[in-house]
Amino acid sequence: MKKIGMIRSGGQTGTDRAAMDTALKYNIGLCGWCPKGGWAEDYPEAPSLLARYPQLTETPSEGTSQRTLWNMRDADAILTIMPEGIASQGTVLGVREGTRLGKPMYTASGTGDIPGILEWLRSLPDGLDLCIGGPRESECEDAYRLTGEILEQVIQKLT
């Protein structure tokens, strides 16, 4: 059985999108909640994200908070990637909710955190539904690239 059974994400640009694209590249299951209509900052009109990522499910709300809260609720564990420690409002909400729910959590800021991520993941059960989140691209220009780099190395070292 794989360590990561499912990558869960809300589909926003930056960290979320890199997590989703990495899941697809490595044939890891993909799921997550997105705002009603599939809204993301680069896909403002329906069907938006849902045309590109049909694995996502719409929340009843068009706002982003419900998406964040529901993804935290439904995950087994939460990996937050905040390049250079940049924390957006949604990222802070996710960390607070994960803490409130008592979920296993790890926060990374760069590739130097890969050994810690690996150690943390190896301490958790196989088949994880892993929620991956962090800032959107408009809040951290390097979020997509850095998240993709981290996740590629982590997945390659887990297999």
Protein language model regions, located:
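Acidic/glycine-enriched connector segments
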Residues: 2-120, 124-129, 136-158
